[in-house]
Amino acid sequence: MGEPTIEDYYVEDRTFPPSEQFTAAALLSDTSHHEEAAADYEAFWARQARELLTWDEDFHTTLDWDLPFAQWFVGGKLNMSANCLDRHVEAGLGDRIAYFWEGEPGDTREITYADLLDEVCRFANVLTGLGLERGDRVAIYMPMIPELPVAMLACTRIGVAHSVVFEIGRAHV
């Protein structure tokens, strides 16, 4: 028997049940979501996507599955930056904490949805002013500072693909 090929890994039969501790802390206390998804997973995920996300254009096909390729929510268009920020501010949650940032000991910040949206829009305008537009690609080389998610969400907001490059470490000279 030779080495396995990629095709040998197309089917996964193992299951990985959550721990009791994880299950106890879950937001769902019954199995109704699981049962609904098991009965008709495409309808389940279509409903979840329409209820939980804001779509600029609705999708016409929930799943186009042609092994080993899958396309979810075919024909749909959304802006993930708007889904991460705008919808929460518009729902009156702008003063809620979007994320907590912790740097060096004692260096912390709480960033609200409204503040984050403001920063993201301002940086998206900077990127647009530099000539970046939908379909362009950028690499973001920044440390883990509060401005990193601002840069990422600003790129997402204007349709610029981005890759984050972290400095793993360097020798002290």
Where are the language model's segments positioned?
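Conserved AMP-binding/adenylate-forming core of the ANL superfamily
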Residues: 35, 81-82, 95, 99-153, ...
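Acyl-group handling in specialized metabolite and lipid biosynthesis
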Residues: 25-33, 66-77, 101-111
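Short, charged, surface-exposed hinge/linker loops at domain edges
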Residues: 15-23, 50-78
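Short, contiguous pre-domain boundary segments
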Residues: 8-32
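Structured binding elements
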Residues: 159
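A short N-terminal helical cap/helix-turn-helix that marks the beginning
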Residues: 35-59, 76-98
